Amino acid sequence: MPEKALVTLRFGPYSSSSGLVDHRVSRLQGLRAVLVSDGHQVILEEILDRNTVELIVNGELVFRCNIKELDFGGDGQLDPLCEEARKAVKDAY
């Protein structure tokens, strides 16, 4: 994969501790930071699938996880899911 890929980060709504279901980017900060630090351009796209995060590279789904499993905030360096996503984008073709 080229060093500077265009990555579409698709994310669905999830319920917060208050019980409200909405699209929020706070759990995506680390994932986004990891991808941007690797030189990728990240585009956020809201989807309707609840609790879902998907990474699309060249029109291909390369990674999917539950948004609630991502660490809240931070730089993503200590989040194992962020490392898994980084590897999936790197290995995309």
Swiss-Prot record:
PANTHER family from the UniProt entry: UPF0728 PROTEIN C10ORF53
A Pfam entry, by short name: UPF0728
Protein name listed in UniProt: UPF0728 protein C10orf53 homolog
Family indicated by similarity: Belongs to the UPF0728 family.
Taxonomic superkingdom: Eukaryota
InterPro entries in UniProt: UPF0728
